């Protein structure tokens, strides 16, 4: 029966939206991480440390799942695999409703993350089979920011009345919806390339490692702060309703960062946009020290959100440019997830006594490290790009004909 359902055009905007939901289903808990961490504290009485570790286990599982799927992607039926992975996510979210001890929940959420990481990696491979995959990734970012902002804005308000299970029920509903959407996606066969050198022997490993390290540090800095952003706001005397609303709206405004990536593209290279974005992230993060002033709290959330979307897109794109076979793109995704997991874990050890000032200072140190690590690979890639452009310009006909 399912095979008789009409399929959307593989490269249409509708298909890109459906694919974005497929990828988001495996990682949506990250977009609502502040609601999840604060919900564990409010509903189950977890400490900052234990709530943060639950979130970290979730993302560490995703990193492991994404790592594994990279080796399996060419040997599996993506549609059948996606069905089973979505069913697995639903099962793990249902199991999370029954887990009440921190360590039981860490185990269940690690398993959930592992399954979700495989689904995200699978979805990313399908993105690469579309025409203009960058557009699909752009749609993905918009979907995640819009839904994540709405979730952070509304879900924390339901936790005091309905408990933590409202969050897991939301994740179940999202996976069920995605399972229905999956039926309308067309086939995306693997594109076999000939003559491509994929052994990685020509990749400048030191520059790549610096690029991957910058991704790791940047994601750790931002997610370490973002996971506890609700608690940070409340520690400065801000009301929960105000904190949730402003964080959610800031997430929506942060779409500007994603749109700027599309507009700017590579016309200014990598180095300048990354440095400018890092500077904005640094200033916004430092401003959280004055969160008792409401307009500064709002400005800090907006600026860091815009910078996060803007910079991470450039960092991932930078790593992907080191080869054309997609190997470095897989590794950058792995580094990203490791950073997203490590940030909340590191933060959880700092907040035993509610020391949010130390958390902010640590985020600033990590951002500085990310800036320095990204400078050399970005500059090197810009030099190569400029050299290629100069060569092409010198061989272009006076009429300026391009292929």
Question: Where do the model's predicted regions map?
Answer:
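A late C-terminal transmembrane helix in Major Facilitator Superfamily
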Residues: 322-356
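Helix-to-loop junctions at the C-terminal end of transmembrane segments
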Residues: 65-78, 257-270, 351
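Intracellular juxtamembrane helix-capping segments at the cytosolic ends
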Residues: 118-131, 309-323
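Helix-loop-helix hairpin linking two adjacent transmembrane segments in secondary transporters
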Residues: 104, 130-187
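Extracytoplasmic gate region of multi-pass secondary transporters
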Residues: 33-34, 207-248, 252-255
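Conserved MFS/SLC helix-loop-helix module at the cytosolic interface between two early adjacent transmembrane helices
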Residues: 64-101
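C-terminal transmembrane helical hairpin of 12-TM major facilitator-type secondary transporters
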Residues: 269-315
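Cytoplasmic helix-loop-helix junction between adjacent transmembrane helices
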Residues: 108-143
């Amino acid at each position: 029966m399912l095979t008789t359902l009409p399929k959307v055009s593989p490269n249409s905007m509708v298909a890109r939206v459906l694919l974005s939901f497929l990828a988001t289903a495996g990682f949506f808990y990250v977009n609502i991480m502040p609601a999840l961490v604060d919900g564990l504290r409010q509903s189950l009485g977890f400490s900052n440390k234990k709530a943060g570790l639950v979130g970290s286990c979730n993302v560490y599982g995703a990193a492991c799942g994404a790592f594994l799927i990279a080796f399996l992607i060419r040997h599996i039926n993506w549609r059948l695999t996606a069905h089973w992975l979505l069913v697995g996510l639903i099962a793990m979210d249902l199991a999370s409703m029954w887990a009440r001890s921190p360590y039981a929940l860490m185990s269940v959420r690690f398993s959930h993350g592992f399954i979700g990481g495989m689904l995200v990696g699978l979805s990313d491979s399908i993105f690469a089979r579309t025409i203009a995959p960058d557009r699909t990734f752009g749609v993905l970012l918009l979907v995640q920011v819009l839904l994540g902002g709405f979730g952070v804005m509304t879900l924390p308000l339901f936790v005091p009345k309905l408990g933590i299970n409202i969050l897991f029920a939301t994740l179940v509903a999202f996976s069920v919806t995605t399972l229905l959407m999956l039926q309308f996606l067309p086939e995306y066969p693997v594109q076999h390339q000939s003559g491509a050198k994929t052994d990685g022997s020509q990749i400048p490993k030191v520059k790549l490692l610096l690029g991957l390290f910058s991704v790791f540090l940047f994601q750790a800095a931002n997610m370490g702060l973002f996971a506890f952003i609700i608690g940070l706001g409340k520690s400065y005397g801000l009301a929960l309703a105000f904190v949730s609303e402003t964080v959610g709206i800031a997430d929506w405004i942060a779409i500007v960062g994603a749109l700027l990536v599309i507009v700017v593209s590579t016309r200014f290279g990598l180095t300048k946009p990354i440095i400018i974005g890092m500077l904005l992230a640094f200033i916004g993060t430092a401003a959280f020290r004055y969160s008792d002033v409401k307009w500064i709290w709002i400005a800090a959330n907006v600026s860091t959100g815009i910078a996060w979307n803007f910079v991470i897109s450039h960092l991932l794109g930078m790593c992907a440019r080191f080869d054309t076979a997609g190997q470095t793109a897989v590794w950058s995704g792995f580094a990203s997830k490791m950073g997203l997991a490590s940030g909340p874990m590191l933060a959880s050890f700092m907040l035993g006594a509610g020391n949010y000032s130390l958390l902010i200072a640590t985020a600033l140190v990590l951002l500085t490290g990310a800036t320095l690590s990204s400078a050399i690979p970005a500059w090197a890639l810009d030099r190569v790009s400029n050299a290629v452009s100069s060569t092409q310009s010198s061989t272009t006909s006076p009429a300026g004909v391009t292929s």
